[in-house]
Amino acid sequence: TEQNRTEQNRTEQNRTEQNRTEQNRTDEIKLLQYVFGYAVVQLGDVATKIYRGSGITREQVTTDGISCVRYGEIYTTYGVWFDKCKSHTQISEIANPKYFEHGDILFAITGERVEDIAKSTAYVGNEKCLAGGDIVVLKHNQNPKYLAYALSTHNAQKQKSKGKIKSKVVHSSVPAISEITIPLPPLSEQERIVKILDRFDSLCNDISSGLPAEIEARKKQYEYYRDKLLSFPHCS
């Protein structure tokens, strides 16, 4: 019908306009990277897709089946990045499955502490896995470990915690995560930074069985150099 054709044309126009806007922003980021060596971007600018996971209850976790992550595990089990899921579930039990795959960033958007809310981790494994409820999945075309390291800095955590009120349960959201800003250098520089931080992270883990004071000192040293490495000129 004429109404359907009009609606279809409007949808196509909106899609074309959205693609043009995204391309303009991509070109702007590349220009800033070329001139200054990096661009300060919002996560919404680098996201190709961002969405929430779907609830997986404790009772639905099994010893086999499809790999999955529940939001609490982002706080307790996974570090800056991980390549294997701890939990599994039966896909037939999940009414509206939401998937994540290699390179995606996962955020836990419910927590108990303002200081920890929206903790994130990069998945660098090769399985297609399920994201549980209260998780936000961010897809992108950047180096996943770089984004994960940048999102673990004190500056990023301040942004995640901004405006949150202390209570028994703290929440974040897709819009709040989309507004987080990070410095974004070209992919080649992202890779160089990741290699340095991976080596440093490995050194810290090597002494994890040492004296508590030594472990704490090395952890603070790592955090200092991580934040220093990810602090670009005029970027606060």
Segments and roles (model prediction):
Residues 1-3, 23-26, 37-39, 178-219:
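Amphipathic alpha-helical segments
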Residues 29-53, 214-220, 225:
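Non-catalytic DNA-recognition/assembly elements of restriction-modification systems
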Residues 3-26:
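Long, intrinsically disordered low-complexity tandem-repeat segments
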Residues 44-57, 73-102:
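Sequence-specific dsDNA recognition surfaces
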Residues 128-134, 165-186:
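A short glycine-rich beta-alpha junction/loop motif
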Residues 34-37, 55, 93-94, 124, ...:
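Short, solvent-exposed loop/turn positions at domain surfaces
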Residues 1, 55, 76-79, 114-115, ...:
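Short loop/beta submotifs within extracellular cysteine-rich repeat domains
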Residues 70, 95-154:
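A short beta-sheet element
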